[in-house]
């Protein structure tokens, strides 16, 4: 019998016990929740809004459908999906982190997004929904923080309806070498300083940079999605591969 307490994974560049990672990631997001939106704009120079807009455009979401915005954080995608599905549809904003979920709920209610949105604290590895529930699932800048990504992908596949699609928007591997070097310099030297100045938390943004480097590259993630059961999997490199959008279907 395997002693699960001895199984390890990565937390950034650190090797930690699998059972510890979720709590460590939770600490990061409890720490940054109040400055999350501000830091997203600063870190990406606002480009994250274009990446999310492209994800919305690729989602195929229509009026009356049911959408899961997983690791939905402060609700950027949920706000858009709420308008797209209308009164006859539903969006579930799910996040494992209570602080992020609270920020998302407050933000969306303040801008009038109510009525067709539900909020659920959920672990991506064991989604608390029946089989074949959602027409579309998105996970935006969240998969790299999941301890067992393969398990999470299988869980997402289970709760998708036949004909449904999963979209994974995540930091990836730059495809242009000079950009890769500049990106490394920015990530490891400038990003933690911004985190220190704005959020008073350099360590969390150092973890961000490290977690990006440990995340599977474009083709590896595509293969992982296929192994989980998804078909017709493809991906789009955005900003020369700094970010990639993967899309797969359940048939």
From Swiss-Prot:
Coiled coil: none annotated. It catalyses: a 2-demethylmenaquinol + S-adenosyl-L-methionine = a menaquinol + S-adenosyl-L-homocysteine + H(+); a 2-methoxy-6-(all-trans-polyprenyl)benzene-1,4-diol + S-adenosyl-L-methionine = a 5-methoxy-2-methyl-3-(all-trans-polyprenyl)benzene-1,4-diol + S-adenosyl-L-homocysteine + H(+). GO terms for molecular function: 2-methoxy-6-polyprenyl-1,4-benzoquinol methyltransferase activity; demethylmenaquinone methyltransferase activity. It comes from the Bacteria. The keyword Membrane does not apply. S-adenosyl-L-methionine binds at residues 74, 95, 123-124, 140. Its EC number is 2.1.1.163, 2.1.1.201. GO terms for biological process: aerobic respiration; menaquinone biosynthetic process; methylation. Keywords: Menaquinone biosynthesis, Methyltransferase, S-adenosyl-L-methionine, Transferase, Ubiquinone biosynthesis. Pfam families: Ubie_methyltran. The keyword 4Fe-4S does not apply. InterPro entries: SAM-dependent_MTases_sf (IPR029063), UbiE/COQ5_MeTrFase (IPR004033), UbiE/COQ5_MeTrFase_CS (IPR023576). Pathway: Quinol/quinone metabolism; menaquinone biosynthesis; menaquinol from 1,4-dihydroxy-2-naphthoate: step 2/2; Cofactor biosynthesis; ubiquinone biosynthesis. Methyltransferase required for the conversion of demethylmenaquinol (DMKH2) to menaquinol (MKH2) and the conversion of 2-polyprenyl-6-methoxy-1,4-benzoquinol (DDMQH2) to 2-polyprenyl-3-methyl-6-methoxy-1,4-benzoquinol (DMQH2). Belongs to the class I-like SAM-binding methyltransferase superfamily. MenG/UbiE family. This is Ubiquinone/menaquinone biosynthesis C-methyltransferase UbiE.
């Amino acid at each position: 019998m395997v002693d699960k307490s001895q199984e390890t994974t990565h937390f950034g560049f650190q090797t930690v016990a699998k059972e510890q990672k979720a709590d460590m990631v939770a600490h990061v997001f409890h720490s940054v929740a109040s400055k999350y939106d501000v830091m997203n704009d600063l870190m990406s120079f606002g480009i994250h809004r274009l990446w999310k807009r492209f994800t919305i455009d690729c989602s195929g979401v229509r009026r009356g459908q049911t959408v899961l915005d997983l690791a939905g954080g402060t609700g950027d995608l949920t706000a858009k999906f709420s308008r797209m599905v209308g009164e006859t549809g539903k969006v579930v904003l799910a996040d494992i982190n209570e602080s992020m979920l609270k920020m998302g709920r407050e933000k969306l209610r303040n801008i009038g997004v109510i009525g067709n949105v539900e909020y659920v604290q959920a672990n991506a590895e064991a989604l608390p929904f029946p089989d074949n529930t959602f027409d579309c699932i998105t996970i935006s800048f969240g998969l790299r923080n999941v301890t067992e990504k393969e398990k999470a992908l299988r869980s997402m596949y289970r709760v998708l309806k036949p004909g449904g699609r999963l979209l994974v928007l995540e930091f990836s591997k730059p495809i242009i070498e000079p950009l890769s070097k500049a990106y490394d310099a920015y990530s490891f030297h400038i990003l933690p300083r911004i985190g220190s100045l704005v959020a008073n938390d350099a360590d969390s943004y150092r973890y961000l940079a490290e977690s990006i480097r440990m995340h599977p590259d474009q083709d590896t993630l595509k293969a992982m999605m296929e192994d989980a059961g998804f078909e017709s999997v493809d991906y789009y490199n955005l900003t020369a591969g700094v970010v990639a959008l993967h899309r797969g279907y359940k048939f």
